[in-house]
Amino acid sequence: MSDLFEDPAPARNTPEYTVSELSGAVKRVIEGEFGLVRVRGEIGRVSRPASGHLYFDLKDDRAVIAAICWKGQAGRLSVRPEEGMEVVATGRMTTFPGQSKYQIIVEDMAPAGAGALMAMLEKRRAALAAEGLFDAARKRPLPFLPRVIGVVTSPSGAVIRDILHRLRDRFPSHVLIWPVAVQGEKCAPEVAAAIRGFNALPDGGPIPRPDLLIVARGGGSLEDLWGFNEEIVVRAAAESRIPLISAVGHETDTTLIDHAADRRAPTPTAAAEMAVPVRLDLLAGLDGQGARLSRCAAETIRRRDQRLRDLSRALPRLDSLVAGPSQRFDLWSARLSGALGQSVAARRARLEPLGAHLRPRLLADLVARQKDRLADRGRGLETCLGRRSERARDRFEALSGRLAPAFARLVAESERTNRRDAAALGALAARLEAAPEARLLRLADRLEALDRLRQTLGYRETLRRGYAVVRADGEVVTTKTAAERAASLEIEFQDGRLTLGARKPRKGKAEPPAQGSLL
């Protein structure tokens, strides 16, 4: 009775798997069924651990797929994955048995469209501009003659060669190159590190600190130039204490580093032209300024000499200043002596009639008193005349003393001016004498450089690389037909010429004579 209520035995035809076997089977099915796939979605939850691998999600409105990009492939991606970016990822589907999930191993990645990439770029530009990183007030003037120029670019390629060649032609300068990757995952961190590294160099250190920086790269697509739109690069350019020129892409290409840089150059060659002036133009300007300075100095000396001569003619002579007062003094002295004689004679004439009526004694007393009075007056007049004469002489001597130092100062000032102008003229003459010699040296250096260029571009340099020149009758043979028709050939090698033996020139096949008519 109890057998009727026993459970039926489980079926034995369903295969039994271990967990590892089932996970491996699922892994083989997924990898074999899908293989290489392209998935379009939005990037979310980006993780960059110290191992260098990239872990992120690809999602849409209804599902999420885990994605992995190994370290070796992450550095070759054309764009840097960021959260919110819409991309098309190419890779292989696989599973991770340890967590029972499927995932895609990304091998390549591209933006889902130029419109999406431009929208993200515009959003980033607006955010950085709102912080003031692109303000014109932050931009600094470029140095006129930078002593050291730092270049951040790839060490190989046409960009660095164009910059060095242009700098060498215009004004040779000391150039420091910081090699970086200009495309891919490593581009942005290496460029930012190079800008900050140049700014960290100390003044007076073993490596000279640049006076100007150039960040350069050739043209490319928006994805190729994306590293220069990264926020880390823009912030490094804005924080640079060294003036910076951005020369990324062609004239039509614009990246965010162009807005943060102090100057933007349309091409790397134009950046070199912005960095330094033309040396020959500066030398020509200096020669012109030297000539103008010489003319101005000569004209200044001539005008001052003429003014000195005019002042010398206008200044009265010392003899003429003293002659008038001295003559008046002599006249007054002569008049005073005559006046004294006349006064004595007049008084004697008045006294003689009176003396005739006086007694001799009284007359003698009167005469004695008058004589004493006259003697006193004479002494008083003599003293007064002496004092007036001394005062007049002192006044003349004081006037003469004031005029003599003034004249001496004027003469000394004129001599100092002449000596100073003569020294300046001598220095200018020395510079003018040295200018032709310096110009001859510059011309000799330029001639030597042109001769080296001529030797480099000459065909004899080509002969040294294993080529040869074939001539026939003095003309260069360039075709096989001309060589076959030549009577002899002369071959020029690096170390001499070789003449091949004469031979008869090949003739074209003669046409058979036409058969004559029997009629």
Swiss-Prot record:
Q: Which UniProt keywords apply?
A: Cytoplasm, Exonuclease, Hydrolase, Nuclease
Uppermost EC category: hydrolase
Q: Hey, what's the signal peptide range on this chain?
A: none
Q: Sorted alphabetically, which Pfam families does this protein's record hold?
A: Exonuc_VII_L, tRNA_anti_2
GO annotation, biological process: DNA catabolic process
**Assigned GO CC terms:** cytoplasm; exodeoxyribonuclease VII complex
Superkingdom per UniProt: Bacteria
Q: Does the keyword Cytoplasm apply?
A: yes
The record's annotation in CDD domains points to: ExoVII_LU_OBF (cd04489)
What InterPro entries does the entry give? Exonuc_VII_L (IPR003753), Exonuc_VII_lsu_C (IPR020579), OB-fold_nuc-bd_dom (IPR025824)
Cited function: Bidirectionally degrades single-stranded DNA into large acid-insoluble oligonucleotides, which are then degraded further into small acid-soluble oligonucleotides.
Q: Member of which family?
A: Belongs to the XseA family.
Q: What is this protein called?
A: Exodeoxyribonuclease 7 large subunit
Q: Which gene encodes it?
A: xseA
